[in-house]
């Protein structure tokens, strides 16, 4: 690599690192992901996302105003062809505490799932159970996963399209048994930034399809849809994620999220219109005894009085 290309490479890598560090730092702050004295178990799969997460967290650890530990953990599920030497060799260069757990979940999955059917769901449950149990064994107070913003948005649409649920992937989650706290520090980061950063850093990526499974076709379909939107409508993905952070249960239709049955109008409320009309003058209606047509344009002619006459009425 020429000197100019090397400088360009380093400059771009540093710029991306600053961006990712800022996003991760903001996510941690917004959701109180990491606290003083935490032992954070970083789950490392060998993919670009978990490598980037560990790299950024180690970087932030040196700058953070609080003290916390980082322990890297990989689960070797005994998939055929898994390069066992890659992760230990990489982690040794970081001088970070780590554990490699060996558990043959691959054989369990093959035994339980008929040939030709997808194994991802059972494999994921077995992996999650093992990691949750190990987190308690080593005294980890937080379990960090490498899911990013694109994963969160894709999950929302997957659940909407195929499960009839408005449910995504939260940046912070308490496990069902209440024993483990899961965090997703990359919740504000885009996959394309992470992919570029991983390439520039030359992380030793391990293929994720060693088990022979196919990519989830439904997720791939949603990902293609979102990529198309991102290409033709810049800013739409950002707007979707912003909307996910600004929900209003009273403006939806979920009866579990808002008690519509208890809504009662206030008979004594002043006639001031709706909040949506708050920028308009508050009018005194001269006569509303009969159903009729009210000339709201009259306001422009009589702003000093703020009174509107009934210009026509109809009584059936």
Curated annotation (Swiss-Prot):
Catalyzes the ATP-dependent 2-thiolation of cytidine in position 32 of tRNA, to form 2-thiocytidine (s(2)C32). The sulfur atoms are provided by the cysteine/cysteine desulfurase (IscS) system. It is found in: Cytoplasm. One of its GO terms (molecular function) is magnesium ion binding. The keyword Nucleotide-binding applies. InterPro entries: Rossmann-like_a/b/a_fold, TilS/TtcA_N, tRNA_Cyd_32_2_STrfase, tRNA_thiolation_TtcA_Ctu1. Its EC number is 2.8.1.-. A motif (PP-loop motif) lies at residues 45-50. Its main location: cytoplasm. Pathway: tRNA modification. This is tRNA-cytidine(32) 2-sulfurtransferase. It is an enzyme of class 2 (transferase). It catalyses: cytidine(32) in tRNA + S-sulfanyl-L-cysteinyl-[cysteine desulfurase] + AH2 + ATP = 2-thiocytidine(32) in tRNA + L-cysteinyl-[cysteine desulfurase] + A + AMP + diphosphate + H(+). The thiolation reaction likely consists of two steps: a first activation step by ATP to form an adenylated intermediate of the target base of tRNA, and a second nucleophilic substitution step of the sulfur (S) atom supplied by the hydrosulfide attached to the Fe-S cluster. Binds 1 [4Fe-4S] cluster per subunit. The cluster is chelated by three Cys residues, the fourth Fe has a free coordination site that may bind a sulfur atom transferred from the persulfide of IscS.
